[in-house]
Amino acid sequence: MSGSVTSTTTETRLCPSNQGSAKKYRPWNDFRSDTLTVPTDEMRRIMYEASDGDCVYEEDEDTRKLEVYVAKLTGKEAALFVTSGTQGNQLCIRSHLHQPPHSIICDDRAHIYNWEAGAIGLFTQAIVRPISPKNNVYITAEEIENKLILGNDIHFSPTGLICLENTIKGAVVPLDEVARISGLAKAHKIPLHCDGARLWDAAVASNVSIKEYCSYFDSVSLCLSKGLAAPVGSIIVGPRDFIAKAKWFRKAYGGGLRQSGMLAAAGLYSIQHNFPLLKQVHKYAIEVAEYAESLGIELEVPTQSNMVTLANINVAILCDEAKKSGIILMGPRIVFHIQITPDAVEILKNVLRRTVERQAVETHIVAKPGEFCVGY
């Protein structure tokens, strides 16, 4: 298994290939996001039995166990458990950037730019210089180089940080491109951060270990509560002094936790038990993507992991058909996760077929602006 994680006994109820007779969890039919995953029965038991030390005083055993495990998994000196992916990204950004003026380069579809409530401006006072990738999949080293602001011209805000997101819209930023971007950043002594909320998916899809991906970044944020089904939390990794600085900001941002052991224990369980299940999730997504294309539906980006992004689809009809069929969608982005069942996949395929049939004749049906959205 990519990511160098050794799986212990996996719960049958979670394994997609065995779900014909397995327990259905609440989000079995929910394709809105992999954030909808819920703790399993075994994870809840682990949480109940977790340590109850104080995290702020650095006395919680299970929190420390998670941080040591992830630091080793990623090949970094230290790790820090945080409450969310947004907090993890913002702690890393703030810890990298010390004194304005400074600017950040990222993909124009990036979570840090679009989905974090303007936190970069609030907390770091940086401007963002986004790039729209010419290949429509991921930004390249050449595009980043053309966007760099170097030198001492006082008219401009110098580039202080480059941020990549992997996966982005379900597409994998290839390792060779990550390496080229890392080389560019190092050449100009600019730190490189990875929003790795779904780096687990990138590792599985590309058969590249988490450690190898992380080796190219100065800091990485990894989410535990999306596809891995932990209830709460992300974890950031980097050099020891960097994590020490981030710990100050975590406290300042209200992220200091007390009895965090139950959440950390769930996070560690999610890596060891649920990470290996992502391969089957990707198979479902690719199966549906291929079926959609056979119906004449175009994809916004290639389906390489757990997302199918539909382009030429009537979203109003799509969501109406989904509602009538008993599955949950909220837009043209379809997200698969470890608690989606085979039955739900088949229902989804029928929904796509009926949508194509209806939109060919019911051309008067149009979604209102803002009626449907793409979540995260």
Swiss-Prot record:
GO biological process, alphabetically ordered: glycine biosynthetic process; threonine catabolic process
Cross-referenced InterPro entries: ArAA_b-elim_lyase/Thr_aldolase (IPR001597), Low_specificity_L-TA-like (IPR023603), PyrdxlP-dep_Trfase (IPR015424), PyrdxlP-dep_Trfase_major (IPR015421)
UniProt biased composition (Polar residues): 1-21
Cofactors: pyridoxal 5'-phosphate
EC assignment: 4.1.2.48
Pathway per the UniProt entry: Amino-acid degradation; L-threonine degradation via aldolase pathway; acetaldehyde and glycine from L-threonine: step 1/1
UniProt region (Disordered), positions on chain: 1-22
Keyword entries, A-Z: Lyase, Pyridoxal phosphate
Modified residues (N6-(pyridoxal phosphate)lysine): 226
Pfam families: Beta_elim_lyase
GO cellular component terms, semicolon-separated: cytosol; nucleus
Gene Ontology molecular-function annotations: L-allo-threonine aldolase activity
Name of the top EC class for this enzyme: lyase
Signal peptide positions (record): none
Catalytically driven reaction(s): L-threonine = acetaldehyde + glycine; L-allo-threonine = acetaldehyde + glycine
Xref: PANTHER family: L-THREONINE ALDOLASE (PTHR48097:SF9), L-THREONINE ALDOLASE-RELATED (PTHR48097)
Protein family: Belongs to the threonine aldolase family.
Subunit record text: Homotetramer.
The protein's name in its UniProt record: Probable low-specificity L-threonine aldolase
Lineage, opening ranks: Eukaryota, Fungi, Dikarya, Ascomycota, Taphrinomycotina
Name of encoding gene: gly1
